[in-house]
Amino acid sequence: MNFSVRRSSLHYLLGDEKSTFKLSDMCGGVFRRDKMTKKKSYLPDNKPFGTRVKEDWMHNKWKYIMLVPVVIYFIVFSYKPMYGVIIAFKNYRPNKGIMGSEWVGFLHFKNFFQSPDFVRILRNTFSISGLGILFGFPAPILLALLLNEIRNEPFKRVVQTITYLPHFVALVIICGLLKTFCLSDGLFNTIIQAFGGTTTPLLQDSKYFYPILIGSDIWQGIGWGSIIYLAAIAGVDQEQYEAARIDGAGRLAQMWYITLPGIMTTVMVMFVLRMGGILNVGYEKILLLYNPATYEVADVISTYTYRMGLQGAQWSFSTAVGLFNSAVNIVFLLVANKFSKKVSGSGLF
């Protein structure tokens, strides 16, 4: 048969009520749109597994080919190094190798938990990460919402360019500028003095370390982080805005009742990812900014691991600390994912 039919029961499968099917194309569980679209969809069938695999390869082979470099990357740089995690349970000696080193069980974990530094570095890590989530996570969402309300396209592009640029500035340069601005005669103190305040070397005072660190992180990442939310906003149904305007809703009401709910799934996914790395505080900026005066509040798990492992050559101990860090991250990831499912109905898994 080669005559065309229209079936309302199949319309929802293609999302197009004008799609045309051919009965000859439905044999074996396959149906097609008409020749104008040349797109194929599949219905459940009873074909052998080998045949289904072959058909899937024929239709998606280029996707699989493009996926190969990604798989290789994760195998080489993520999964293969996992073999070295075993040294967290051994007294590793380079001359004996991983398998030849003495097994000590949870000794390094016990030493870490009993260390006088444990409470301090854990407190600092949670403080910096918590402040980053509290102030840094909503910042790109707010910027995306504000950019979406700008109707002047040239001005909008200028704002986007200005906010995106800091992401591409080298971290060393940013830290160098911060150190210069925070001097007693630097830019920040000049502004403080202009408003009647007293000057002080800001990076030498521990109470200013967190605001400087978190503020610079927000400044550097707010523009780049807003891109994904702008993309999510672009996917919100425009008919909802038109209906809201007809009902007399203003921009603020549209933002609150249409835009935010429309991007909530994206927000929750990003929140889960952020919570999954709650203890992964970037140590590079901290290493470049902290000093003996701020060491008490700036030392975190990542800098502690760096100091113990690379500077102190305590490879097994630092691996145990890193493994503890990963275990805590997994727990927070699972909790955040469950919370996301309750709030938005979707999660990472």
Residue ranges with predicted function:
Residues 9-13, 20-22, 42, 201-202:
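Acidic/proline-rich low-complexity IDRs
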Residues 1-3, 7-8, 28:
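Targeting/processing segments of secretory and organellar proteins
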Residues 8-9, 34-35, 181, 276:
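Small/flexible residues
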Residues 41-43, 55-349:
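A structural signal for multi-pass alpha-helical bundles of membrane permease subunits
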Residues 2-5, 15, 40-43:
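N-terminal intrinsically disordered, low-complexity tails enriched in polar/charged
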Residues 5, 21-25, 66:
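Intrinsically disordered, low-complexity repeat segments enriched in small/polar residues
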Residues 12-35:
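Short, Lys/Arg-enriched N-terminal segments with co-localized hydrophobic residues
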Residues 27-56:
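Short, Lys/Arg-rich, polar N-terminal cytosolic tail immediately upstream
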